[in-house]
Swiss-Prot record:
Record protein name field: Cysteine desulfurase
UniProt cross-references to PANTHER family, sorted A to Z: CYSTEINE DESULFURASE, CYSTEINE DESULFURYLASE FAMILY MEMBER
Organism: Enterobacter agglomerans
Enzyme Commission number, as recorded: 2.8.1.7
Function per UniProt: Catalyzes the removal of elemental sulfur atoms from cysteine to produce alanine. Seems to participate in the biosynthesis of the nitrogenase metalloclusters by providing the inorganic sulfur required for the Fe-S core formation.
Length: 401
């Protein structure tokens, strides 16, 4: 079997209905939405229709709370820099140790500028250290910025409760919801989240389009300045075709949300199939609430890069948080934050499904993985099955005889 795509947390295939919605704006409606003549009208209408569709999926109270951007990374940078510009006397930021680089890189930059960054840790299952979070909240904090769902493990964070706690101390709260939107129901009007980032290409929309949710009456400073677009909050002529595509993708995600139950069933089947047929494996976030589409399993004593290469040979696309994919000799920062031992962290593989995933594809992956792992372990200097000892009380605390 070929073309089994299980890397949907990286990007998704564009839905044919999304492409169909975009085509008129690539072919026929080429006017500038800011223009008052007839060529601008259809583009302006498409822009506002998409804004309504995005607001509906996010459960926003007002369509004006949606600001279109080029991507979620831009939205996240905008949120962070806006918050610190509005509270220059507050020189602390709270984030987590397992954020996406879009957040971590900005925080590292600000740390070099003199900001104190509180990086909230996680347990070995990826659960947030809430006690550490509450201790870090103070009048010196300008912003809390954290993800709703982790991109590597799928573990969900209690962002609604975290946002309420931040508000009680007068702190703005931003959420990176890239991996949550379209996979779990979201109602922002029922939360205290001030700002939220999301992306079109993670929900079967086009690349090059994202948005920032900005709660009404939240003070704001734009990052991209120039024209009056997006009510003066994000300058630059809008990517109308991309925005229309994002709107269509959001509407379809809303319609197909019930399908996430069947996606979760396939995810569970994949987990069970791999864990029961391959020894010395660990499911990341096994006992934590997770997105319904994400499986991250560590296969001990082998490298994730080698697994991916052999999977690709079998026509299966997946992803790894191990050293190879980042060009580093270390496992991913998420695996290290979870304190996953060396021999397991290097062999972690993420399989991420979508509503386009089929059961036969899951069965094909289950069939191929045992042989792949067995072949690689015969080449591993760490794999001496008759000498591996499992320490009492933990699957991954090996000693070598």
């Amino acid at each position: 079997m070929k073309n089994v795509y299980l890397d949907n947390n990286a990007t998704t295939r564009i839905d044919p209905m999304v492409l169909e919605a975009m085509m008129p704006y690539l072919r026929d409606y080429y006017g500038n939405p800011s223009s008052i003549h007839d060529f601008g009208g259809p583009c302006r209408a498409g822009l506002e229709c998409a804004r309504e569709q995005v607001a509906s999926l996010l459960g926003a109270a007002y369509t004006s709370e949606i600001i279109f951007t080029s991507c979620a990374t831009e939205a996240t940078s905008t949120a962070i820099y806006s918050a610190i510009a509005l509270a220059p006397e507050r020189r602390e930021i709270i984030t987590t140790a397992v954020e996406h680089p879009a957040t971590l890189a900005v925080c590292e930059h600000l740390e070099r500028q003199g900001y104190m960054i509180h990086r909230i840790g996680v347990s070995e299952e990826g659960a947030l250290d809430t006690a550490h979070y509450y201790d870090a909240l103070s009048e010196n904090v300008a912003l809390v910025t954290m993800m709703w769902a982790n991109n590597e493990t799928g573990v969900l964070f209690p962002v609604s409760e975290m946002a309420t706690a931040a508000h009680e101390r007068g702190i703005l709260f931003h959420c990176d919801a890239v991996q949550a939107v379209g996979k779990i129901p979201i109602s922002l009007r029922a939360t205290d989240i001030d700002m939220l980032s999301c992306s079109a290409h993670k929900i079967h929309g086009p690349k090059g389009c994202g948005c920032l949710y900005l709660r009404r009456n939240t003070r704001f400073r734009p990052l991209v300045r120039g024209g009056h677009q997006e009510r003066g909050r994000r300058a630059g002529t809008e990517n109308i075709a991309g925005i229309v595509g994002m709107g269509a993708a959001c509407e379809l995600a809303d319609v197909h949300m019930p399908m996430m139950a069947s996606v979760q069933e396939m995810r569970d089947r994949l987990e069970t199939g791999l864990l029961t047929t391959i020894p010395h494996t660990l499911l990341m976030g096994a006992n934590q609430p997770r997105t319904p589409n994400t499986v991250n399993i560590a296969f001990e004593y082998i490298e994730g890069e080698a697994i991916l290469l052999l999977l690709n040979h079998c026509g299966i696309a997946a992803s790894s948080g191990s050293a190879c994919t980042s060009g580093s000799l270390e496992p991913s920062h998420v695996m290290r934050a979870m304190n996953i031992p060396y021999t397991a962290a290097h062999g972690s593989i993420r399989f991420s499904l979508s509503r386009f995933t089929r059961e036969r594809e899951i069965e094909w992956a289950i069939e191929q993985m045992p042989d792949i792992v067995a072949r690689l372990r015969t080449l591993s200097p760490y794999w001496q099955q008759d000498k591996v000892q499992i320490a009492q009380g933990g699957l991954f605390a090996p000693t070598y005889g």
